Structures are given as C-alpha cells and as structure tokens.
C-alpha cells in the first residue's frame, strides 16, 4: 500500500524550473530517502507534497487522496529551516506546538516527558530555547515533529548539528517508529545513514528524478563499473582502466565505459598477473550519487 504517490509533478518559479516531471511512491511503513544535491528540487517537492506549493501540473495522493486539514494532523514535518520559539522555555514551546495538533494537555505532558528523557533533555526543559545548543534544539525540533504520533513523518536533514551519540539516538528512534508502522520520508546528504536506514530512495537532480528503487536494486544496477583485485605482482597499466584506487590491501580498478569485468580478468591473465582476489565491486551510495549526478549534468 502506498501512503504517498507523486505523479509527474512540476513547478516553475519565473525562469527556473525547480521540479520537472518528478514521479515516485512511498510505501506504508518504510523509510524512504529523498536525495539530491543542493538546489536539486527536493525542498520544493516536499512543499508540493504538503500543499504549501501548488504544482503547475501533476498530482499528489497522500494518506489515500488529496491533502485535507484533517490529514495535516496525521503528518509530522521537520523542515531544514528550524522553527522553535526562542524566548520561551523548551517545555512551554513543545507543549504549545503539541496543542496545535489537538493533543490533550495531560497526554502531551506524558509523551513529552518520555521524549525529553530519551533525548537527555529533561534537565534542560525550563531553559529558554535560545539557551540550548544547536544539537539540543535539533533534538527538540524532532520531538515537536513526532509528539502527535503521526502516520507519516517528513524530515529534512535530521542529523544536522548532532554528535555521533545523538545521531545514534535519532536513528534508533526512527527505526523504532518504522517498526511500529510509521512511514518516514527522509531527506539528507549523509549517504552512509541512508545506506543503513532506507528501504528505497529517489534521487533528484536539476528538478528531475534520475534514480529510483531499492538500495539492493540500485547497487546491482551500478555494479560492474569497477573490480576489486589483490595481487603480489605489480598491476600493469591497461587502456580499459581509468583509475586504480588502493583500498585496504586491495586495488579498486575503475573501468572505462564499454569495458566488462571479464575483459580485465583476461587482460591481467594474459600478462601473467597472479591474482589472489578478483571480484566485481559493489559501489557505495556515495559513489553512485556522484556518478549519477555528474552523468545527468553532462
């Protein structure tokens, strides 16, 4: 079941085509990655999903149909531009934001107490928001996003300003939410977090969706562009190899466009190179990201 369906949306601002025929679907109960370089159209796409912007054409189905006022209370949104009130206490700020989502006061206080303890913020609840560190404010912003227990959570750069310990706290929370059926759409530049957490992704560049699918499918699609080899013999220079990168005792050979891994194996064998290891490299998401973005810009 799809909780979010984006069909051929487009949005222009003056001469700039911010979003251009973007399509993807988000399944219920998954963590979905919305990826792309700065200025790719991610934030505009999110604002179209949430009915902040109207698309020039295309359609959006969210929670089973068009956006309504009732559905807004079933969605949690954490924008990259944070929006906490700075001159009131942390507790007062979060309780006020909870009231906007129609959470009864006693229930809001109970949930808030649990989240403040989980995120090591309980001792700071009476401080003004502006007195908190950026990392603390980031955690508080996340609490405000999920306090009403939304069915769909849309978060933009959830790990910004967080140290490794707090990154793990946020990851554990998001994974717990997924385990309980919450759907999460996450936009981030931290590819290693995407690899660890996301079930599927879409990559947007220059307003277009250029990559879409599960991480396993995408890795298989891009395997074959490089091989990992290990040999005690020196590796010869081959015309079919465009780069040789040392990696933990191995060498990753990046292949030219029309070269197949077996071509390299044969070429090395013909030059009497004794191989201890030869396997097709599985690229990281960082490598795929760079390859696709550079390719779509040429």
What are these language model-derived features?
Residues 1, 85, 103-104, 252, ...:
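A general boundary/transition motif marking the beginning of the first structured unit of a protein
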Residues 2-4, 11-205, 211:
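ABC transporter nucleotide-binding domains
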Residues 10, 68, 91, 191, ...:
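Alpha-helix N-cap/helix-start and coil->helix boundary motif
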Residues 171-256:
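ABC transporter nucleotide-binding domain
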Residues 224-298:
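Short, charged/small-residue-rich alpha-helical element at the C-terminal edge
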